[in-house]
């Protein structure tokens, strides 16, 4: 038996073209039904084949097969059987029923706002007296944004050199715990997570070890627990540069992370912020909201737009295209980097706040509501289909 993963077209092997093994689907991928969605499943096989998918006969156009198959459960197995040629293949797909018309705002490379809160702990009466966090509070209060901040453990020398004055010397262990209760109070919409030890070196986990990433995670997570409470900790993150080999991803999964986000987008000659994924898989994930890598039990989410990468006008035009995209516009993930907020940073963006608020406003006015990845990827009321706890033959029954 063969699993339905992306491969070169083979007219003599029964293979799923859409969805593929590990695909996450939602209402944008099919037609809504009373109990879920109807997917138009596409396969390739022998031209003379007679194929059934979960007991539903597929139409055959010279070896290209389509079948309208209901998907109603969080996890479903699709079994295709060519009863004429004796070929069978199956895939597992996931249905995130609450992942349409949702958006997420995240930020990477965070640490400096915590230094400011610590330095001003006797002056500030709230964490939102910090100007940087105040931007996200506005995004939440005005547009319902749910915000996710990925943290460095320390400000390294090279990163500090890009600021004037330099913020070198600060690490999370210095963060005040005075505002712990306020972090907890706002933890329904404001989440914190491990990013990496520091900004440099780049891509620390691309060739890293489980021991290294675990040590860095422990250092960051211990301090988040201390100054913000376990309620603020997210089970999703983006590792620094979205680069991590399988060993490091396995370590993160064992530590409790359920999802990782990245670009899965080509810059020049290579895909970046794409973890260990092959170019072929990056091409696929880059056109989806989510993908579930069953081999590592890890969900991968597509970051749709990095707010600090383009001019304001280009950013806004790209956001419009994403919203209208048939397979990326269900759950829209927007992201920015903390350092661009500060006038002391060499690449400061004076319109940082405008970019964040305008993007959130546009999504809100187009019917989107804020959500954390955990909220849309949890099984909740959707249970594994009991029909698939036993081997499904894929044969039509009478």
Where are these regions (language model features)?
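Surface-exposed, short loops/turns at beta-strand junctions within beta-sandwich domains
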Residues: 68-75
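Short coil/turn motif common to extracellular beta-sandwich-like domains
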Residues: 32-40
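Active-site beta->alpha N-cap acidic-glycine motif
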Residues: 90-181, 233, 334
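Active-site-adjacent pocket scaffolds in enzyme catalytic domains
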Residues: 116, 159-174, 178, 231-232, ...
């Amino acid at each position: 038996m063969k699993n339905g993963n992306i491969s070169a077209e083979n007219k003599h092997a029964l293979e799923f073209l859409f969805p593929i093994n590990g695909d996450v689907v939602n209402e944008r991928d099919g037609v809504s039904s009373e109990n879920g969605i109807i997917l138009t499943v596409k396969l390739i096989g022998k031209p003379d084949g007679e194929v059934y998918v979960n007991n539903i006969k597929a139409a055959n156009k010279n070896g290209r097969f389509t079948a309208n198959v209901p998907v109603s459960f969080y996890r479903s197995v699709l079994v295709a059987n060519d009863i004429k040629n004796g070929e069978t293949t199956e895939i597992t797909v996931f249905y995130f029923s609450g992942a349409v018309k949702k958006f997420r705002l995240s930020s990477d490379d965070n640490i400096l706002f915590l230094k400011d809160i610590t330095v001003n702990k006797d002056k500030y009466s709230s964490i939102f007296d910090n100007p940087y966090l105040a931007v996200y509070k506005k995004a939440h209060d005005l547009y319902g944004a749910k915000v996710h901040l990925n943290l460095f453990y320390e400000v390294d020398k090279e990163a500090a050199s890009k600021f004037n004055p330099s913020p070198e010397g600060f690490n999370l262990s210095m963060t005040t715990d005075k505002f712990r209760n306020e972090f907890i109070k706002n933890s329904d919409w404001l989440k914190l997570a491990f990013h990496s030890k520091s900004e440099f070196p780049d891509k620390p986990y691309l060739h890293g070890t489980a021991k290294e990433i675990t040590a860095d995670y422990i250092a960051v997570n211990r301090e988040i627990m201390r100054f913000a409470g376990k309620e603020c900790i997210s089970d999703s993150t983006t590792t620094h540069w979205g680069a991590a080999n399988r060993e490091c991803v396995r370590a993160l999964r064992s530590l409790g992370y359920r999802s990782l986000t990245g670009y899965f987008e080509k810059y020049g000659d290579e895909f970046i912020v794409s973890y260990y994924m092959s170019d072929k898989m990056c091409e696929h994930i880059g056109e989806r909201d989510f993908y579930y890598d069953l081999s590592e039990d890890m969900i991968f989410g597509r970051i749709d737009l990095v707010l600090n990468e383009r001019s304001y006008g280009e950013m806004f035009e790209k956001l419009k295209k994403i919203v209208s995209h048939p397979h990326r516009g269900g759950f829209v993930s927007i992201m920015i980097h903390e350092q661009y907020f500060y006038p002391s940073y060499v690449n400061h963006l004076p319109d940082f706040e405008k970019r964040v608020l305008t993007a959130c406003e546009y999504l809100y006015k187009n019917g989107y509501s804020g959500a954390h990845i955990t909220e849309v990827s949890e099984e909740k009321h959707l249970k594994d289909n009991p029909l698939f706890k036993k081997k499904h033959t894929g044969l039509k029954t009478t």
